[in-house]
Amino acid sequence: MKILYVNATVRPDSRTKRIARYLLDRIPAEKKILNLGDEDIRPLNNEVLEFRTRLTSAKDFENGIFHYAKDYAQADTIIIVAPYWDLSFPALLKNYIEAINVNGIVFRYTDKGEVDGLCKAKNLIYITTAGGKIISDDYGFGYIKELAQKFHGIENIEYIKAEGLDIEGAEVEKILQNAEKKADKIIEMFNNKNN
């Protein structure tokens, strides 16, 4: 099994990353680590979009511009780790999504105009933490879930969150341990599937 770990955290002492490491360290698999803060993934602009469209129209996917999309499409499981910022996630993750969402690699349009997901992965795990309360799961996690299921063809989406971490009087360690318990259930599911 090959896991793609997409890290959209930027703080070295990230609590989101702590939960992710807890999970990742307990799933035996080949792991590709992608720290988005170390990558130079920029928002799509007209020049890049036109270049990419020329390549995809010609079905020329050998250009290095597509390596993020190929890694994503070929992973067996994807773990996305992002703090809850501004009702969703950091811009780093949105830039990455624009880079991977390539027609012909991650998805395709059928003759009827419907979307057909091309990803090998059957599982995506989304991990987030918030200093306050997560107002709605729809904006961050919900967006990732819809994109993964409807566009990428990934069936099983798991969600681990720890919220209220910066609220005065919060029992931070207990909140994080509860998130790790959710991770334990996912680990058990993976171990059962792979035995």
What do these predicted ranges mean?
Residues T9-D13, G131-I135, L165-I167:
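Short histidine/acidic/glycine/proline-rich micro-motifs that form metal-
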Residues T110-H152:
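Short, glycine-/small-residue-rich phosphate/pyrophosphate-handling segment
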Residues A73, A91, C119, H152-E155:
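Structured loop/turn residues at beta-strand edges in well-structured enzyme cores
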Residues L34, I127, I160:
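Hydrophobic residues at beta-strand termini and immediately following loops
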Residues I135-S136, G142-N195:
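Glycine-rich phosphate/pyrophosphate-binding loop and the adjoining helix
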Residues M1-E98, V102, K181-N195:
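N-terminal beta1-alpha1-beta2 submodule of the flavodoxin-like/Rossmannoid cofactor-binding fold
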Residues V102-K112:
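Conserved nucleotide-sugar donor-interacting segment of glycosyltransferase catalytic cores
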